[in-house]
């Protein structure tokens, strides 16, 4: 069985714009996804990237154009300037890590739910009520938002170190075997790779 390690942050517009295509690809190929939320700002700093405020204006403008194009392409509405952004991604990341450990729900729906809440629904995904609601909607015990936070925080740090050591430098980032794919616009390539065509 193929395995896909998925490095992401819940506050990335491009994680949101990936929708559930990764999950669809994994289902087609019988692949297993391991969800690995990371501190994207720390990942950028460690691998030569720049946080959005430090990027050149042309890069910022292109980002907005690309967000609009991908939104239209995939039928996912997006607010390019959400009410609660930037927002601390750690609480939602901890909830995802705890949910993955606990099992019983739909992790893909949980990840997409947090990203959608941020980028399409103007919700504060660091707020406990929002976290509990997203857990419940994805079939998990909402009480996970209060349990296992220390171990989840440790896993969050480990995910960052692992991402750096495995050559990830942005989000979303997908690794299967030795093959790396950066960006939701590379999901088609991941699909072709798993099909043995690329």
Segments from the language model and where they lie:
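C-terminal cap of thioredoxin/glutaredoxin-like
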Residues: 4-5, 10-31, 109, 113-198
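Structural alpha/beta surface segment adjacent to cysteine/selenocysteine redox centers
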Residues: 10, 17-118
């Amino acid at each position: 069985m193929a395995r896909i390690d998925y490095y992401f942050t819940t506050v990335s517009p491009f994680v949101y714009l990936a929708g559930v295509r990764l999950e669809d690809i994994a289902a087609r190929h019988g692949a297993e996804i391991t969800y690995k939320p990371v501190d994207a700002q720390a990942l950028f700093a460690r691998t030569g990237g720049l946080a959005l405020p430090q990027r050149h204006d042309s890069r910022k403008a292109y980002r907005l154009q690309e967000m609009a194009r991908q939104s239209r392409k995939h039928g996912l509405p997006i607010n390019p300037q959400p009410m609660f952004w930037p927002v601390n991604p750690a609480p939602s990341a901890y909830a995802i890590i705890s949910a993955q450990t606990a099992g019983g729900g739909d992790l893909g729906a949980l990840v997409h739910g947090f990203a959608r809440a941020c980028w399409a629904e103007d919700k504060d995904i660091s707020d406990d009520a929002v976290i509990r609601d997203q857990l419940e909607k994805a079939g998990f015990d909402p009480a996970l938002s209060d349990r296992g936070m220390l171990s989840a925080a440790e896993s969050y740090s480990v995910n960052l170190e692992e991402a750096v050591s495995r050559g990830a430098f942005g989000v979303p980032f997908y690794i299967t075997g030795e093959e790396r794919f950066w960006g939701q616009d590379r999901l088609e390539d991941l699909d072709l790779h798993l099909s043995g065509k690329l």
